[in-house]
C-alpha cells in the first residue's frame, strides 16, 4: 500500500470513529492525564479543562510536539484550554526523534493518533464538528501535512512554525492558521511559510497567516490568537 492509499484509508477510518453514548463513557476529572495507550516512555497526555462536564460536547484540539519531545511539551496550551473550554489531546510520536512522515512515511503515528482519538471519544464528550489538529515545529509540519489529508475529520489546522508540507491526499477543506517568526534560524521563513501560504491560498484554502518578530519559539500572543481563531 502506498502512502496515498494509506492516508485515504486513514481519513475514512478517522471520520468513521463511533459516537460513544454518555452512559458508556468513563468518568474523567479536569487536569492532565496519561493516555496509557503506548509504551511507558512514548505515550501521550490528555488535558481536561476546568469546568468540564459530560453534559455538553466540548471542542478538541489534537496538539503535536516538536522534534525530540513528547506530548507533555504542549503544556503551553493548557491554561488557554481552561480559559476557552477545550480538551487537549497530545500523543507522543512513535519514534523519539520525530513524526513518521518526516522520517520514512505515514504509518505508525497516524495509527496511534487514531487510537488516541478513539480513546478520547470513550472518555470525553467531544463536539465532532469542532476539532483542530495543530502543533509547533515538526508538530506543525505534521499537522499541516496530515490535516490536509484528513479535513473531513479536522475542520481546523494550526501550524506554529512549520518546516515542510507533505500531504499524501486531500480530504475536505480545513481552515488553516499558520504563524512564523521572521528570524527563525531552524526553519527559515522564506523557504517555509512564505511559500506554503500562497500555495494553499491558490488551492482555495481559507488561510490565516501571522508573521511576528521572533525566532523559532512559540509566542503566547500567537497561541492565544490561534485559540480565538478556532474557538470564537
Task: Tell me the role of every PLM-derived stretch.
Residues 66-70, 94-97, 137-140, 163-166, ...:
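Solvent-exposed loop/turn segments at secondary-structure junctions
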Residues 130-172:
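Primarily recognizes the serine-hydrolase "nucleophile elbow" in alpha/beta-hydrolase
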Residues 174-180:
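Catalytic His-Asp charge-relay segment
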Amino acid at each position: 500500500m502506498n502512502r496515498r492509499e494509506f492516508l485515504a484509508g486513514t481519513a475514512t477510518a478517522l471520520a468513521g470513529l463511533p459516537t460513544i453514548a454518555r452512559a458508556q463513557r468513563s468518568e474523567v476529572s479536569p487536569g492532565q492525564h496519561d493516555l496509557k495507550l503506548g509504551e511507558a516512555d512514548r505515550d501521550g497526555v490528555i488535558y481536561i479543562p476546568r469546568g468540564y462536564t459530560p453534559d455538553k460536547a466540548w471542542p478538541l484540539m489534537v496538539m503535536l510536539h516538536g522534534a525530540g519531545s513528547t506530548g507533555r511539551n504542549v503544556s503551553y496550551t493548557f491554561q488557554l484550554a481552561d480559559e476557552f473550554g477545550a480538551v487537549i489531546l497530545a500523543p507522543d510520536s512513535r519514534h523519539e526523534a520525530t513524526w513518521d512522515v518526516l522520517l520514512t512515511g505515514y504509518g505508525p503515528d497516524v495509527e496511534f493518533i487514531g487510537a488516541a482519538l478513539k480513546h478520547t471519544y470513550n472518555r470525553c464528550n467531544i463536539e465532532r464538528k469542532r476539532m483542530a489538529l495543530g502543533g509547533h515545529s515538526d508538530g506543525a509540519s505534521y499537522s499541516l501535512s496530515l490535516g490536509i489529508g484528513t479535513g473531513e475529520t479536522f475542520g481546523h489546522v494550526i501550524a506554529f512554525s512549520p518546516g515542510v508540507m507533505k500531504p499524501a491526499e486531500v480530504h475536505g477543506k480545513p481552515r488553516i492558521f499558520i504563524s512564523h517568526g521572521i528570524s527563525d534560524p531552524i526553519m527559515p521563513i522564506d523557504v517555509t511559510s512564505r511559500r506554503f501560504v500562497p500555495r494553499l491560498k491558490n488551492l482555495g484554502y481559507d488561510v490565516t497567516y501571522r508573521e511576528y518578530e521572533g525566532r523559532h519559539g512559540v509566542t503566547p500572543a500567537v497561541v492565544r490568537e490561534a485559540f480565538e481563531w478556532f474557538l470564537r
